[in-house]
Amino acid sequence: TSSEAASEASESSAEADGAEEGTFTVGFDQDFPPMGFVGDDGEYTGFDLELAQEVASRLGLKYVPQPIAWDAKDMELEAGTIDCIWNGFTMNGREDAYTWSDPYMDNSQVFVVAADSGISTLADLAGKVVEVQTDSSAEAALKDNQELSSSFGTLQTVADYNTAFMDLEMGAVDAIAMDVIVAGYQMEQREDGDNYVILDETLAAEEYGIGFKKGNEELRDKVQTTLEEMAADGTMAEISNKWFGRDVTVIGK
């Protein structure tokens, strides 16, 4: 049957595609909710990871979530310890560094500040302490916008955004530059979420995609086809509604 043929095809190519034969190993930052993080039960969860798990299941591969240090993601991919980077991974500015899926989600880089900070525009960030995750898209966007970043009093990096929010809460920093999807989720989940606001002016508009090792079109094509099937049958919208209360995906639209 066609399903048996598809299963055999996926098994025969798994050795070439997988970090280990028959597996689909997804590299992600475990401190990046709601895309990928450690849930209350100690298990890895998140919007991207649920999508990845469904893709693996449909391809007949064993799903393996592999947390990585975000600044070591390229090394992990080149070494073959992961099959892809799938975790709110911005395509913009990295177009030629990976073999990419089509974009599945829009994103923008924004600034989060304390609601009572008196900061309401990008110009108000002049002389302020701004924090950003190391090797993140927000950091890259700030490097591209020297006029803005040079106006800051200090631009400092942090390992993850959970730490950044703690720094903002303590008043150690004045603003965090980060993904709007993640910022909104963090603010919804935090008991003190109403104490923060996202500035209306954005830093950069972007798209999320899945990054594969350069040249691995075979695995990329399988994943892309599966994502398109998930979009068509409503599975992608269902997973999106679970995490965001709406369909934030762009495949097939």
What are these regions, as identified by a protein language model?
Residues 30-33, 44-57, 89, 110-163, ...:
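Bilobed "Venus flytrap"/periplasmic-binding protein-like clamshell domains
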Residues 62, 137-156, 194-198, 228-253:
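Ligand-binding clefts/hinges and TM-proximal coupling segments of bilobed small-molecule sensing domains
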Residues 72, 88-97, 141-146, 169-170, ...:
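A ligand-binding cleft/hinge motif common to bilobed small-molecule-binding domains
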Residues 49-58, 128-129, 134-137, 184, ...:
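Extended ligand-binding regions for polar small-molecule ligands
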Residues 53, 57, 62-124, 202:
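Acidic, polar ligand-binding/catalytic clefts
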Residues 30, 106-113, 180-184, 188-228, ...:
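Periplasmic-binding protein-like
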Residues 1-44, 57, 118-129, 253:
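Immediate post-signal peptide segment of exported/extracytoplasmic ligand-binding proteins
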Residues 49, 64-75, 117, 155-170, ...:
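Short helix-initiation/N-cap motifs at beta->coil->alpha
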